[in-house]
């Protein structure tokens, strides 16, 4: 079994209090709790969540999420490798600084994951949803059921992929969940990766994703205009483009309010490529977009991403190794109901860069705008 060291932030009274009363069902869950909860608790405290919300959020995480994280990762154990991190770990915390909102993402894993019963982890997400749905009002699975059926492999697809040895080193993650924590409540989201479905059907990821969302638009026509605008932009880049659709996400709420996001991976890491993603090749030219473009250029200059062509690396990194690689760029485009154009969001992929240099760049960026609470 693995062992852990409690991080310095373990002084959180909430983490310590909950830990005093836990009767863990197995050692794996104990390791997961003590390696993630101290940082989780500290992030909630720093972000200003009240004490009641902190206890509720950590209680949900302990009882309804940790049981779906699988075996605790070590360098020697056999475990499911998730696309969520370059080390294959299935859990990640994040913080929306401008809104002081904590969120976490995980790929649900159960005992059948990676076995002949569920070789590509298609089914465990349903068990995870069964645990979460009674905890939060307003969860709606209409979009999820539609997209999952179209974009993840079924048992017949799985058998075909295995019999023909088609997967190889292909990343096997197909779906994951995210919780945006708003007070003591949460908004549930899903992310879906169609790469295995593309292998099984012979269709491109782009075709699978856009066709599925177009079918979704039959019942939700208010999403069609931004979808068509995005497809026109993607198609305009041509068949040899370094940018291609990779995954999509949606909110698991009332379909009339749910947003769909389509993610584009860009192998060409340059400021010009990021500017093109941000403006959709000049299609977005309103005042807000242009103001954001100037901020993007400033941040690029501060962080100094090394330019070049970057393939998504294989295989996963060994636990404990220091990364010596750079990832491609990524952008997502949010399809809002009744809006003509999608809303862009670009990612500065700083993985593998010096953390201190990146932090210094962000501090400078925040201070220039008077966002001292974020710096």
UniProtKB/Swiss-Prot annotation:
The lineage of its organism: Eukaryota, Fungi, Dikarya, Ascomycota, Pezizomycotina. It comes from Trichophyton verrucosum (strain HKI 0517). Substrate binds at residues 103, 189, 191, 259, 261, 263, 345, 347. It catalyses: L-tryptophan + dimethylallyl diphosphate = 4-(3-methylbut-2-enyl)-L-tryptophan + diphosphate. GO terms for biological process: indole alkaloid biosynthetic process. Pathway: Alkaloid biosynthesis; ergot alkaloid biosynthesis. InterPro entries: Aro_prenylTrfase, Aro_prenylTrfase_DMATS. GO terms for molecular function: tryptophan dimethylallyltransferase activity. Tryptophan dimethylallyltransferase; part of the gene cluster that mediates the biosynthesis of fungal ergot alkaloid. DmaW catalyzes the first step of ergot alkaloid biosynthesis by condensing dimethylallyl diphosphate (DMAP) and tryptophan to form 4-dimethylallyl-L-tryptophan. The second step is catalyzed by the methyltransferase easF that methylates 4-dimethylallyl-L-tryptophan in the presence of S-adenosyl-L-methionine, resulting in the formation of 4-dimethylallyl-L-abrine. Homodimer. This is Tryptophan dimethylallyltransferase. Belongs to the tryptophan dimethylallyltransferase family.
């Amino acid at each position: 079994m693995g062992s852990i060291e409690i991080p310095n932030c373990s002084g959180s009274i909430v983490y310590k209090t909950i830990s005093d009363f836990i009767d863990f069902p197995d050692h794996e869950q104990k390791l997961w709790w003590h390696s993630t909860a101290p940082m989780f608790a500290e992030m909630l405290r720093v972000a200003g969540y009240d004490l009641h919300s902190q206890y509720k959020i950590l209680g949900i995480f302990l009882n309804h999420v940790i049981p779906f994280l699988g075996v605790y990762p070590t360098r020697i154990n056999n475990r499911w490798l998730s696309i969520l991190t370059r080390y294959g770990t299935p859990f990640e915390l994040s913080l929306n600084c401008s809104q002081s909102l904590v969120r976490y993402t995980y790929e649900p894993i159960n005992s059948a994951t990676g076995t002949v019963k569920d070789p590509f982890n298609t089914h465990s997400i349903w068990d995870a949803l069964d645990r979460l749905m009674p905890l939060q009002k307003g969860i709606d699975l209409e979009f999820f059921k539609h997209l999952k059926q179209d974009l993840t492999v079924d048992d017949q697809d799985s058998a075909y992929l295995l019999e023909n040895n088609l997967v190889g080193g292909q990343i096997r993650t197909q779906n994951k969940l995210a919780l945006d924590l708003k007070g003591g409540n949460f908004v549930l989201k899903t992310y879906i990766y169609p790469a295995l479905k593309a292998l099984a059907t012979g269709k491109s990821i782009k075709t699978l994703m856009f066709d599925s969302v177009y079918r979704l638009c039959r019942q939700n026509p208010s999403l069609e205009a931004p979808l068509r605008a995005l497809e026109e932009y993607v198609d305009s880049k041509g068949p040899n483009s370094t940018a291609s659709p990779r995954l999509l996400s949606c909110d698991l709420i009332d379909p009339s309010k749910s947003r769909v996001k389509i993610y584009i991976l860009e192998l060409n890491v340059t400021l010009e490529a990021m500017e093109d993603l941000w403006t959709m090749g000049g299609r977005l030219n309103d005042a807000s977009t242009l103001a954001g473009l100037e901020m993007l250029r400033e941040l690029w200059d501060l962080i100094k991403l090394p330019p070049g062509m970057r393939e998504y690396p294989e295989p996963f990194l060994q636990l404990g190794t220091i990364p010596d690689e750079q990832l491609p760029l990524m952008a997502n485009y949010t399809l809002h109901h009744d809006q003509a154009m999608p809303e862009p969001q670009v990612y500065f992929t700083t993985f593998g860069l010096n953390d201190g240099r990146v932090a210094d760049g962000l501090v400078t960026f925040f201070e220039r705008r008077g966002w001292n609470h974020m710096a």
